[in-house]
From Swiss-Prot:
Expressed predominantly in brain. The gene is CORO2B. Keywords: Actin-binding, Coiled coil, Cytoplasm, Cytoskeleton, Repeat, WD repeat. Pfam families: DUF1899, WD40, WD40_4. This is Coronin-2B. The keyword Cell division does not apply. The keyword Signal does not apply. Its main location: cytoplasm. It comes from Homo sapiens (Human). Binds to F-actin and to vinculin.
Amino acid sequence: MTVTKMSWRPQYRSSKFRNVYGKVANREHCFDGIPITKNVHDNHFCAVNTRFLAIVTESAGGGSFLVIPLEQTGRIEPNYPKVCGHQGNVLDIKWNPFIDNIIASCSEDTSVRIWEIPEGGLKRNMTEALLELHGHSRRVGLVEWHPTTNNILFSAGYDYKVLIWNLDVGEPVKMIDCHTDVILCMSFNTDGSLLTTTCKDKKLRVIEPRSGRVLQEANCKNHRVNRVVFLGNMKRLLTTGVSRWNTRQIALWDQEDLSMPLIEEEIDGLSGLLFPFYDADTHMLYLAGKGDGNIRYYEISTEKPYLSYLMEFRSPAPQKGLGVMPKHGLDVSACEVFRFYKLVTLKGLIEPISMIVPRRSDSYQEDIYPMTPGTEPALTPDEWLGGINRDPVLMSLKEGYKKSSKMVFKAPIKEKKSVVVNGIDLLENVPPRTENELLRMFFRQQDEIRRLKEELAQKDIRIRQLQLELKNLRNSPKNC
């Protein structure tokens, strides 16, 4: 297969999205005064749904994040209540796609936690999670909810494992153990039957998640992959990464044949990570650079040249990460097709950016709003774990988003025990993988040995004292 090297010059074609533009919200509709985390982990640190905006914050003595009702814009008070139950920095947060007041978080403290946000938002600091999930032996960098199944959560840790949690029972039910280094990104196809990952070992993988079997694997020598996203039902993957000349690059792949990318395109010479976002309804791809203020957007097609450049949104304020509003939360009366929530660390600002298709008519535009995945799960955990796949339950945006009958998350009652998956106790110490880890483990063991020796010495002294007391009692004259 030959690789098509695309020109840097934009290719114009007839498209109803060629005039899409980005509109920044007015300052009074932004969220100001937020101490956004300074953590250098390559995540968005932001999650949004139709009710709440969650942002990971800078804090001392453990990790925390804010949860703000969307209507509460403007300046946020410094003492605003936080979710602060983690003992380490929070690295990722994701809202449950089917229950809009349930959020998952993961942290450097090796745990994943599930939180239930009160109806009107937080009134005081929240320290007790609805559910604590312990199964990783090192910090947890990623969490992802299954796209069609309720209460199935995926987590990826620095122990190179992906755990699949059934939250109905509060335990890991599967473990994917095919990676040889830190997992950088996870993405599902439309029905959640396939999982694709990128890894620090420079490999791109397509995995059957229930069995953990690797279906396709690419060793990316000329394109060091960082992020990956499934392109809806096109059977295509798009990755962002770095070329051999250290320029930012994207590549398009056939998910059934990862031997060679279909196309590669160099973007620019900046060093920040490229975050890809794909809208399956409009077939539009958005590329946002970490550390710059630009968002490029393209249209994806199944025929060559596959990728057509549309336009670029430019902003002088650099972005640390971006949250994305679900489709049913968009303003269809304004022909809004995508909405970002941009984290501007230097200003402590969260800035909504609406991507709008200019139309003269105020009527509902059916051509840009097809049926879209809604808020009802298609499967139960037992059905999905039993091997059933089902497409998302679709909804129309014509009448606007109407909240369906409320689903309630019921936390299982858990007993403390060892966590065994695939015959392996996940809470046991795992062997060190690097020299630094080996040294740290060695020094910890030395400290433990020293402490145990001191305890033994104290117990020996106590034993001798008791022996002397017993001897004295035996030798003392009996009381008459």
